[in-house]
Amino acid sequence: KFDKYEGEVVVSKEKIEEAGKKVDQKTKDDILFAYERIKKFAEHQLKHLNNDFEVELSKGLIAGQRLIPIDTVGCYIPGGRYAHISSAIMGITPAKVAGVKTIIAASPPKDENGANPGIIYAANLCGADVILNLGGIAAIASLTYGCFNNPPVNFLVGAGNQYVAEAKRLLFGKVGIDLFAGPTEIAIIADKKADKEIVAADIVGQAEHGYNSPGWLITTDKSVADYVMKRIPELIKELPDGPRDSAEPAWRDFGEVVLCDT
């Protein structure tokens, strides 16, 4: 209703193939680059976590540890104002490496064709077994209860807006969740050796996430403080309309530059 989407909720194999054709080669290369590195890290992480053992504490009394992957994981991928392709890679890839049997991804429809093609392409590449054209509260509820002939998930991962966060809070206990995520924020500690342009750009990069995203700079160098305070409004003006509409109030209401003696 709210997405004004009337197509199929479950993304078919044909639609997955269509999505792949809509993604340009540069974006595909970037997705593969990120996927391979996240996968490599997850594989090494698993190798160091997977320490199964048994020990006989006393005669006939045996204790041990086994790490067993859960059966089903739901990966929520934000896609409202921005296509969070990285969320698809970071959520699905570790679950696949861990050996989760069924991975269900959900992302809100971008238009009448469903979720963003880049998100669908990345989710499929990383190993999602099912992809849903579904966002927000409806997606979280559907993943939890298994509303589209898919099994209810055991665990939910993935960020979202305040409504997604509240849905996860309400369902916590019925389903496992990763965390209660609030607005994105950034705090940078910098001295005179810092690259002033990168400091300013990093703060703006977080401020554009939402009107309530704080950004702080803590520095001992006045030239860094002065440059960043002058440069951030300039960078915000260069943003497209949507990100600028978020970054301006975020910096105005929640931005701070703290100049310290030591």
Regions of interest found by a model, annotated:
Residues L125-P214:
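Conserved NAD(P)+-binding/catalytic subdomain of aldehyde/semialdehyde dehydrogenases
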Residues L217-T262:
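NAD(P)-dependent aldehyde/semialdehyde dehydrogenase
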Residues V55-Y121:
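Conserved small-residue-rich beta-alpha loop and adjacent elements
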Residues D30-F33, R37-K40, T72, M90, ...:
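Alpha-helical scaffold segments in soluble metabolic enzymes
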Residues I16, G20, D24-I38, R66, ...:
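Generic structural signal for well-ordered, non-membrane alpha-helical segments
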Residues K101-K110, G215-K222, V228:
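Short internal beta-strands
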Residues K1-D71:
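N-terminal Rossmann-like NAD(P)+-binding subdomain of aldehyde/semialdehyde dehydrogenases
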